[in-house]
């Protein structure tokens, strides 16, 4: 793996291959998503960035900072509460009305982990925010990603590498489970769905990232300020700063180290590799497989045995079929309008 300094250098050269880029950051009003958006804006000559989230006040601050970082860019806010799939559909429709192409869909949205709560659409809220809503964004914006010629990529920041053996009779978590279990359950379905989508949409890369221990507002909300401070002290030697997280995430979102299964052109593989970099092994165990399960620093962290076991059972297809069925039940349409 390239070092952080080598990744910074690669990001600084990003405008050579991506003088313009269109990106949507779902969860870009704070934390990891906000920082990634700012890093990208500073690395590209003329970015067009959509900040997608709930908080208008936070969005106004982020948009102002983006304009200050790069006045040549275009920055817009799309307001949405992603805990309801019908809201996700409206947000995607708004994005489709504003652009005909999308180079990057970067998703890091999600509330703090809390006790089980069901939405008015009948789904477990944590699972919606960490899986169903993210996949609905992905599904709805695939046509825009397919229209890109700049290494189109979907990035989901969650718990790559922390997949588990799923309860096959409880995919929608109708049977209550803990918030931590729910998140790992969502991470598993994310990795499986991305592996499936990479074989169907072969010109698009799908990346599932474990962000590492990053000091963000969500840490305080999830643990409480006192416990968050204790956790931060304990994990500080293993932690990274928001700035470092932003550098790593921009690299994973653009680098040729994570190409789609079948790039349609030379640019389609991504920006130049950092010094010391190489094409990454995908979730299938093959180099350049199109779907990737990555550590915060861009290294492969696929649970090979677990994912192979799912592959033997064709479980990626099964999970995607379940996902479409859920979309049909909740929104009245398996496919977006």
UniProtKB/Swiss-Prot annotation:
Record GO biological process: terpenoid biosynthetic process
Pathway: Secondary metabolite biosynthesis; terpenoid biosynthesis
EC category: oxidoreductase
Effects seen without this gene: Impairs the synthesis of anditomin but accumulates andilesin A.
Claim: Ribonucleoprotein is one of the keywords in the record: no
EC number: 1.-.-.-
Function: Oxidoreductase; part of the gene cluster that mediates the biosynthesis of anditomin, a fungal meroterpenoid. The first step of the pathway is the synthesis of 3,5-dimethylorsellinic acid (DMOA) by the polyketide synthase andM. DMOA is then converted to the phthalide compound 5,7-dihydroxy-4,6-dimethylphthalide (DHDMP) by the cytochrome P450 monooxygenase andK, which is further prenylated by the prenyltransferase andD to yield farnesyl-DHDMP. Further epoxidation by the FAD-dependent monooxygenase andE leads to epoxyfarnesyl-DHDMP.
Matches recorded under PANTHER family: ALCOHOL DEHYDROGENASE-LIKE C-TERMINAL DOMAIN-CONTAINING PROTEIN, YALI0E05731P
Similarity field: Belongs to the NmrA-type oxidoreductase family.
Name of protein: Oxidoreductase andH
